[in-house]
Amino acid sequence: MKNTYLTGYFPLIAILLFSSSLSISTSLYALKMLSSFGMYDGMLDYFSEKGIRLALFAAFALLYFMVLSALKLIANTVTELSLLFFANDPEGNNLKKLRMGSMIYLGGGILSFVLLQNVIWIVIWFAVVTLAYFVFTVYRIYSTLSLMSLVGFILLELLFWFTFVIGILFIFIKLYNSIMASLPV
């Protein structure tokens, strides 16, 4: 690619695509839940149907955009920290090699609209796209790293994300248990 800045907007567009598909799917599910609880008809007395749909979409889109943006920031930081520790690349050539990987997320974001009927399928698709990006990352930089540096890079990335996911799950379990313990039984 001639201009290295051409792909600079791909991560933002991919985040917008994934957050839009997730928020559409979540909005449809929330509308079903509101209808099953009998709240939707009461809401129609005060708001139009389009207004309710738009408000739900905007709220979920903002939530998913913030989460995906934070994950992108964390992922970039961990990748650059891993490269700092294990790559002998003071000019940053490895980072330039990884720029085209944003096309993987862009394509995944476009294809996520096929899976709008179920949030779980979109999350699974996001995990598959993330795994494909990780394989792309390792493939692009393996020639510049020694075997031990490559193993260290992979282990640091995997260990961080494993610890991060386990930590988030632990926090949600603790929160759930504290809410359940505070309920009068």
UniProtKB/Swiss-Prot annotation:
Keyword flag Cell membrane: yes
Entry-linked Pfam families: DUF5366
Topological category with respect to the lipid bilayer: Multi-pass membrane protein
Keywords: Cell membrane, Membrane, Transmembrane, Transmembrane helix
GO cellular component: plasma membrane
InterPro entries for this protein: DUF5366
Subcellular location(s) per record: Cell membrane
Keyword presence, Glycosyltransferase: no
Transmembrane parts of this sequence: 4-24, 54-74, 98-118, 119-139, 153-173
Protein name in the entry: Uncharacterized membrane protein YufK
